């Protein structure tokens, strides 16, 4: 982030109202998000900025965001051909040769989402706590269980999101991962618990 801000003669406060800067930041976040998917073996990785994704539209209605998905995290695909762009501008799709998800959106639009807790909870927790850079992002991390990004999504998601902030404590976005609930159920089968009243503790 620091390099992108420096190259664009910008400050972190500019994220709040500069849609063009935000799209530049997101384009540079593509590789880190791909690495997150591969290293964590998850279906989704996303970053949502604390600023607008469209010119002349406030962040509260259309936030700048990049949301990637793979339906098969355990398989290898050359040139990341398994990845879908769920949220992100077309320029990112063209630059990285990404197929668009069936319900693709250019920005994170809360009014179109079935549930926004994966963003709202860590975002508001950090703001309300007047968080400082001395604490770890995980102090405001939030697990969201069995939700869907959009009502028409086929798979229920489990997500984990944390706030992003700089050394002075300025909140500039949310970073998170997601995986299909059915994937977790497949590796933690209920049959393994037997009849003894056991349970899985996550």
Question: What do these predicted regions represent?
Answer:
Residues 28-32, 174-202:
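Solvent-exposed, extracytoplasmic
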Residues 3-8, 50-55, 124-131, 165:
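Short regulatory "switch" loops immediately downstream of catalytic or recognition motifs
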Residues 4, 32-39, 48, 69, ...:
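Structured segments of extracytoplasmic/periplasmic soluble domains
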Residues 1-34, 38-43:
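Juxtamembrane extracytoplasmic/periplasmic/luminal helical "stalk" adjacent to the first N-terminal
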Residues 88-178:
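Extracytoplasmic/periplasmic ligand-binding sensor regions of membrane-associated signaling proteins
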């Amino acid at each position: 982030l620091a390099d992108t801000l420096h190259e664009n003669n910008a400050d972190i406060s500019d994220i709040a109202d500069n849609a063009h800067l935000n799209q530049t930041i997101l384009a540079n976040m593509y590789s880190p998000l791909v690495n997150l998917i591969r290293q964590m073996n998850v279906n989704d990785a996303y970053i949502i900025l604390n600023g607008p994704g469209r010119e002349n539209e406030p962040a509260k209605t259309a936030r700048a965001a990049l949301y990637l998905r793979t339906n098969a995290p355990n398989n290898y695909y050359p040139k990341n051909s398994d990845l879908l762009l769920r949220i992100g501008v077309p320029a990112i799709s063209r630059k990285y040769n990404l197929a668009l998800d069936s319900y693709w959106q250019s920005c994170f639009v809360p009014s179109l989402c079935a549930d926004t807790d994966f963003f709202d909870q860590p975002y508001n927790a950090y703001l309300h706590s007047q968080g400082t850079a001395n604490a770890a992002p995980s102090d405001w991390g939030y697990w969201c269980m069995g939700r869907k990004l959009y009502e028409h999504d086929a798979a229920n998601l489990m997500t984990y999101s944390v706030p992003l902030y700089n050394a002075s404590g300025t909140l500039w976005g949310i970073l998170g991962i997601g995986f299909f609930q059915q994937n977790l159920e497949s590796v933690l089968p209920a049959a393994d618990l037997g009849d003894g009243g056991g349970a899985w503790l996550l």
